[in-house]
Amino acid sequence: MRDNLKWDTQIKGLTKREIYSLGWEIFYYCRNVLKMKPRGNVYPYLHIYPRKRTESYGEYSSSIHLVEIYAAECDTLRRFVDTVIHEYTHSCQGWVGVKYSSYTRKFGYYKNPFELEARKVARENRTSCIKHLQEAFGQ
C-alpha cells in the first residue's frame, strides 16, 4: 500500500490491485479472526467494481455465492471495510437466499433480520479489522 491505512483513506486513491488486496484480506480477517464460516465453508467469489455502477455499496448474490463491492461508492476505508464485512456476513447466513425477500417484504430492508445482523457484525468489528489491515500491510 502506498499510503498509511486510516479510517479516512480514500479508496479512489488506491489501485485496483490494492483494493482487491484489501478485500481479500478482509475476507481472511472474517474467516480466520472472527471465525465466520461462509456457506459450504468456501470463500465467496469477490468482484470489486472500481467505478460507480449503482447507489449501493455492495451486495451478496446467494445463488452464485458472489460478493460484489462498488468501490467508487465506498469513499473511505471505513466504508469499504464496513461493506466487505457486511456482505461477507451475508455469505455466512443460513437461508439468506430463501428467506431474504420474504423478510424484506415483512419487515422492510432496514429491519430485515439478515441486514440487522450484517450491520451489527460490521459495526462491532470495523476498528479491529482496520488494525488487522495495518498489521497485514506493514503499517
Locate the predicted segments by residue.
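Charged phosphate-binding loop/patch that engages nucleotide di/tri-phosphates or the phosphate backbone
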Residues: 2-12, 18, 123-139
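Short, aliphatic-rich beta-strand segments
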Residues: 5-8, 65-71
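Zn2+-dependent metallopeptidase catalytic core
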Residues: 15-41
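Surface-exposed helix-capping loop/turn segments at secondary-structure junctions
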Residues: 32-41, 98, 129-136
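Catalytic zinc-binding patch centered on the HExxH motif and its immediate surroundings
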Residues: 40-41, 45-66, 75-78
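Short pre-active-site segment immediately N-terminal to the catalytic Zn-binding motif
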Residues: 67-84, 108-110
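Post-HEXXH active-site segment of zinc metalloproteases
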Residues: 78-79, 93-122, 131-134, 138
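Catalytic glutamate of the conserved HExxH
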Residues: 83, 87-95
